[in-house]
Amino acid sequence: EVNPEADFDIASNPEFLREGAAIADFMRPDRVVIGVETDRAETLLRAVYQPLYLQETPIVKTSIETAELTKYAANAFLATKISFINEMALLCDATGADVVALARGIGMDGRIGAKFLHPGPGYGGSCFPKDTMALMRIAQENGESLRVVEAAIEANGAQKAKMVKKIRDMLGGSEAGKTIAVLGLTFKPETDDMRDSPSITIIPALLEKGAVIRAHDPQGMEEARQLLPGTIVYTNNSYEACTGADAVIIMTEWNQYRALDLERLGSVMKQKIFIDLRNVYQPDLVKEKGFRYEGVGRS
């Protein structure tokens, strides 16, 4: 029912929670953004966040429009940072440089910061793809263009295709008839979220060319079964996934994949090809165990 005498306020209070760390982010936020039009709305929201007062959490008061754009702008900036370091990783591949050392070298600059300078197969999840596209749409509706954000989106799509080529090259130019173990399916660790995960693009591309995929993920396999082709063999652990494999791919950096027994791994594989799309391992350590190693921006 319509109540023309209803007394209310409108406010915007965007969340900045990370999947897998939502409780910690809620309890100890970097800042709280409140977009309000009235003193009453501001007073109410400040009261809601009063428990954070002792932590001296900054509360940023803005207009409603600014608060809404702040959410999109934050995620678009982080997505752009990821796309930037991914493109630098490709350049490092071409020149023989080490992107991990490069990231440390620029990340120690206080103007840049070390966070989100970790190259990989591209960003995914529910936030970055959605929010970058939403920001682009807002710009278009208001007669503006966001060329940097647009380039970040395009670079992210290209990164996934580059990873397919990297895998193919490590297999001698063709994945047809090759068995590939994929460790990690979700877009990031500590979640079962498969939305826009790089695996959703990369695995079908490999299957299309005749690869056999054996996969493992601590939390994402149930969801993966709904989204990925039915020919994938899902396994109980990393070593089962790698049994008879020509290559193993670290797709998602779950902690359990950071401490693999490389000797055991090599003993069950058909070929010892290690493709580290998250740069989890030191290349020399893997090579010492008899593997051919390929990372992203380092080899």
Predicted segments, located by residue:
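Structural/interface elements that position substrates and couple domains in central-metabolism enzymes
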Residues: 1-299
